[in-house]
Every structure is written in C-alpha cells, then in structure tokens.
C-alpha cells in the first residue's frame, strides 16, 4: 500500500472517533486542551492497537471476527449512547448541577474501543495483503489522535450552545455511529 493510500485509510478510520469525541467534548464543562489531548491519546492508542490485534486474529480466525465485530460495536455504542441520553434527560431542573470537567478513563477507553472495531476488521483484511502493519497502525493511531483532539475542541464550542441537550446529542451520535456500522455490514 502506498503512502497516500495509507494516509487516506488512516483518516478514514479516524472519523468515528472524531464524531464520538465531538459528542464527548460537548458534554464537558469547558474542557481544557489537556483534556482534549488526553482523549486524543486514549483514542489514538486504542486505534493503533486494534488493527494490530485484527491483523494477528486475521492470521488465525478471520471469518469469526468479521462475523461479530459489527454486533459488538453496535451493542457497545448503543449502550453508551443510551446511557448518555438517559443522563441528559435525568438532569436536575436547577442549573446548579454542573457538567463534568473530564470524562472517566474507562468511559473513554470503552468508547474508543467501540469506535475502533472497524480498524480491527481492517487489520484482519490487511493480514492478507503485503503491507507494513506497524506503519499502517501507527498512521491510523496518529490520525485518530489528531481528529479526536480536534473533535473534543469542536465539542467544547458546541456544548455551551446546547447546554444539557449536549449529552443527549452525544448519545444520539454514538447510537448513530453504531447503527451506521451495523448498516454498513448488512448493506455492503
């Protein structure tokens, strides 16, 4: 795979993480740049590892992985998105209830993992091609770091405009991503 194809693949794989990080940024109370970088690092690290795992699994059992990855991503994203929607509607009527200043580590890891399962499937496919899996995985991770960090900062500006509805919107985005993954599997 040539350099331009690798870069296009990397940024294509980062789009789900970008959308999810916009939703995450919108639900925080004025996230700082350091929080955006933290989120980018978590998403980027996981997005780097999943194609490597997929590549390894592709060498072993590609058919099983390809049959189930879309369902796993869909269930995780619908669960996380549903939780965000419920929290958005549950909020206190007085505005004294302030948005969090940062998301928990495991919530970010779970979201990052759910949005990176397509990269794992790509890794399975790459197992059958003559590519440098390490270079490709690093490119995907770097692109995801950049896009997730930018997504958090974009979400920072959207969040104050939406208020408590930002959490509902973030949940809808996650459910939409999960649905798109499932739809792509059955339509494609």
From Swiss-Prot:
Keyword check for Manganese: yes
Primary location class: membrane
Transmembrane segment boundaries: 3-23, 41-61, 62-82, 107-129, 143-163, 168-188
A single GO molecular function term of this UniProt record: manganese ion transmembrane transporter activity
Location of this chain's protein in the cell: Cell inner membrane
Any one of the GO CC terms: plasma membrane
Membrane topology: Multi-pass membrane protein
One Pfam match: Mntp
Keywords noted in UniProt: Cell inner membrane, Cell membrane, Ion transport, Manganese, Membrane, Transmembrane, Transmembrane helix, Transport
InterPro entries assigned: Mntp/YtaF (IPR003810), Put_MntP (IPR022929)
NCBIfam families the record matches: PRK11469.1
Function summary: Probably functions as a manganese efflux pump.
Entry similarity comment: Belongs to the MntP (TC 9.B.29) family.
Protein name as catalogued: Putative manganese efflux pump MntP
């Amino acid at each position: 795979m040539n350099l331009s194809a690798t870069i296009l693949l990397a940024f294509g794989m980062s789009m789900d993480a970008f959308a999810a990080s916009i939703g995450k940024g919108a639900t925080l109370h004025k996230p700082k740049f350091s929080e955006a970088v933290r989120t980018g690092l978590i998403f980027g690290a996981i997005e780097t590892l999943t194609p490597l795992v997929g590549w390894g699994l592709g060498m072993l059992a590609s058919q099983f992985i390809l049959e189930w990855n879309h369902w796993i991503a869909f269930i995780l994203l619908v669960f996380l998105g549903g939780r965000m929607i419920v929290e958005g509607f549950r909020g206190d009527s007085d505005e004294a209830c302030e948005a969090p200043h940062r998301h928990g580590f495991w919530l970010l890891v779970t979201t990052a993992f759910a949005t990176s399962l397509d990269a794992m499937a790509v890794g399975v496919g790459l197992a059958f091609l003559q590519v440098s899996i390490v270079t490709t995985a690093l490119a995907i991770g770097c692109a995801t770091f950049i896009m997730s960090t930018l997504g958090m900062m974009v979400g920072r500006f959207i969040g104050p405009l939406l208020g408590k509805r930002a959490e509902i919107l973030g949940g809808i985005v996650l459910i939409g991503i999960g649905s798109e993954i499932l739809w792509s599997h059955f339509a494609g």
